[in-house]
Amino acid sequence: MIRKFIPILPLIAALFVTFSCDPTKNNPEVKDTLTVSPASLEFEAEDASAKFLNVTTNGDWSASPSADWIVMERTSGTGKASLPVKVKPNAGEDRTATISFSGADKVTVSVSQKGRNIVTVVANPDSFDGTKRSSTTYQLLIYSFADSDGDGVGDFKGIQSKLDYLDGLGATALWLSPAHPTPSYHAYDVNDYSTVNPKYGTEQDFKDLIDAAHAKGIKIYMDYVLNHSGTGTTWFKDALANPDSPYRNYYVFSDDPSADVAAGKVDNYGGGKNPGMGDWHSVSTGNKGYKGRLHYKLDWNAKTVTVTESTERAQSSNSDAKIWLFIGNDGCVGLYQTSTNVYEITYDTDTTWGFLVRTSTTTWDGGTKWGGDGKPISFGQPYALNNSTAADIIFGGATSYYFASFAQSMPDLNYGKYTECENSPAFQEIAATADKWINLGVDGFRLDAVLWIYQAQIKANQRFLDQWYQRLNATYKAAGHTDNIFMVGEAWEGHNTEKQYYKGLTSCFEFDYFDALTRALNGNASGYVSAVNGFISDHTAQRADAVTSIFMSNHDQHRAAESLGRKLEKEKQAAAMMLTTPGKPFIYQGEELGYYGKKDGGDEYVRTPILWDKAGMDCAKKGVNNKVDNTMLTSSISVEAQDADANSLLNVYKTWSRLRNIYPALAEGTMSVAPGNGNSIAAWYMTAGSQKLLVIHNTATTAKTVTVQDNTSRAVGLLGTATLDHDALTLGPNSSVVFKL
């Protein structure tokens, strides 16, 4: 029998190799592993996206979340996997949980989710240290602010009685409307710069007001009208009556304006040929008398005299006359009777003043002198005689003209050539009156209509204002003050013109400011900071000590509330924005109460008196000739009503003015852009020394959320509503917040 040999050794070797290639099954020292990465997951409160865990293993695995807010599509498997993990929205506090993995190893992954943690912002400002630093001025109209004696016209004592109110508004100064005697209610046609209007009280009353205001840290600024006076000044009346009057050069007179302007003789034009605004007004000045041949006809029945120019042969005086003319230096000239009670003469007349009619040559008594009523005679027209007034019968004055930038009742003052304006009699006299008020205690001046002093000629006006400022600042220093006098000019023009007036004054009203503010309130908030900083940098480029005076409206404009659409929330935010802006803010009488109105029916309607109580018993309506809008001036808009309402516009002004007094950064700081600016978000920093504040305004009518990286733990100012969710700040409609950093 034959046996076959089967080679089994290679088979054994192959099997050995096969089993040796799986170390986990054939080598007890090599184990499977389980790894999961990352080791932690972090989610936002409203995070809807998935985050992924990477599982690495060759074996089986399982996952177990410790909380039901963790959502996993798979919780078990074999081998490698990429696991999406989501979380449910978290409306509560921050939370953490784990995902435990089992398999070759035990692995724990931590999962955290931020809560919404919505914190309602509450303002907690520092205490007021008693130092008033807000640099906030309240503009008031003496005639309509407060009436102390019940005559319906505001007065000095009325203002003094309301100083606590003004102090509560944070005012550091009061700008008073012109305080001088005047024929008008508004007082911009001054008749005497050296005294006060008796309707407002006495000079002692004014002094008492100044002293009482100073005791509360409130300065007093007078409104001074330098461009023109009223026609009732002693100066103007004398200048009209006498062409040789020493006051003639106080005003801009000309016998031939066109020729004088063309020849460059009108100093008031500042070298220009076109005044830009204003008119020449004709007047008969003085009494020019008459030299020439005249025919006189006296009708003694009608008691009239008719005078005509004549070429007939001249007559000599009638020595047998019963009635006479008294002419010039000739004395009595006898008339010839030509019919019953009619007397005539043709006479070569030479008189510098005029003539009279006399019925006696020996006495002036007993009604023997007959004259007129002071008006000049007109040739060929019967002129009525009387023996009661018996004023000289004059031939009229020379026709002349005076210039007025505004009304005929406001003749422009003349300061001569601008290069030597400080030497002009008008400058010296008016400056002397201002010296008086400084020595009485006045702290500064608002200068009216400075554009027109030299008819919008910038260089001329700059020099005049510089000389005026230097003169009065010297008086102020001599009175014992260590600071400089404050003066603000009304250069009512756009910013590019207005800024040039800082060459003459330390401050001017920025008429473009309210435009920037309204743009911010109407959807262009992101441009607010750059606009304000542009104003300030342009002013300080003119002079280092420049003060930018900002305001919403004044007595010559439509009310701010009118321009804001009478929308209370906008009015509140406008106040908050202005009072957190660098510069010197001015609050106009009634603005803090929400007064609205247009000039269309008369300026009085934007100069409404303050309604102090609901009953309106002490409202100075007569001060504006009783021209008030009674549909606006109701009890709800009164000081009494708004004081009692914590959410009133008045209390917004009080709150934000107080903040400005508390924090130097708001009153004296520099402004810089903060992150978050947008169409409806205006955000900026205010910094002074080591103090820094973050100011954010939402000007939209809906809530807006902005990310804030700064420390928001301390809010010091709040208008409307604000909440914080970590670094997400949500401001309610027309809401504002200030954080102390």
What residue spans do the PLM features occupy?
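Loop/helix patches that line or flank the sugar-binding groove of alpha-linked glycan CAZymes
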Residues: 478-481, 551-554, 565-693, 699-703
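Acidic/aromatic-lined carbohydrate-recognition and catalytic surfaces
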Residues: 122-293, 357, 396-421, 439, ...
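C-terminal beta-strand-rich structural cap/linker in extracellular carbohydrate-active enzymes
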Residues: 726-741
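Surface-exposed binding patches on compact interaction domains or structured appendages
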Residues: 33-34, 52-84
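Bacterial Sec-dependent N-terminal signal peptides
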Residues: 2-5, 9, 13-42, 108-126
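A short beta-strand micro-motif common to beta-rich folds, especially ectodomain repeats
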Residues: 93-104
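Insoluble glucan recognition modules
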Residues: 26-27, 116-123, 128-131, 136-138, ...
